Amino acid sequence: MAMHSEKQYLDLYQSSSRIIKKNSAEVLNAVRDAAFEDFRRLGFPSRKVERYKYTDMSAIFEPDYGLNLNRLEIPVDPYEAFRCDVPNLSTSLYFVVNDAFYNKALPKVELPEGVIVDSLSKIAAESPEFIGKYYAKIAKTDEDGITALNTFLAQDGLLIYVPKNVKVERTIQVINILRSDVDLMVNRRVLIVMEQGAEAKFLFCDHAADDKNFLATQVIEAFVGENASLDLYCLEETHYKNRRVSNVYIEQQANSRVNHNVITLHNGITRNR
């Protein structure tokens, strides 16, 4: 029998799956029901699971958070909300507000030809075969309850694509801003596809713009092709009311190189895997 923590999410999906699907892309929707069944079976990981030994996951997910299932636009000026300045680092700067790619403020400097940094659900709607090849392929929902939960609730997120042999010189910086007038749960998805010989550096910064209780789940899937090189730095500077659970999955081909670092400066509870 699912405890209260699980039950509210099972009930939520059963009552709202139509709304969730209506406001997302078919490729993301295609795996929801199976992920829901996996979550129903797995529930939240208990402390008996080695990698969750020190965190009471049920307690993190127990409070009643709001969710923006109807994709209402949340007013924010990201430039006012946050500066994530890293000295002497010149970046191409993008914003994700809660789980939605912010397309009103894009970097002035153009990326190399063919490189895409955009909304995951937008690209999934435009190129379903391409996204379908990668989405939810290495983030297995039958092995981790948190990944399953994220997969049946996530409606959007970020897609980064670097074509074959393209080297992105300038670091791509993505600032994830949590912004809400009520306590909010955010389920964000990130898909990174680096083709053969591609090279890029990413800096993801997590911030909270409001003094509210936030719960953010995030699943990152990174596919790194032969001889490709990926540097992924994740930096969190939120506040004590922030709960963050992030699972990272990386698939590497021959002679590829991945450097993944996570830095937590200020937070409430964070689980990075």
Pin down the residues of each PLM region:
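Conserved beta-strand/loop scaffold segments within soluble protein domains that form the structured core
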Residues: 110-118, 126-273
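N-terminal amphipathic, basic helical "cap/leader" segment at the start of enzyme domains
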Residues: 2-148
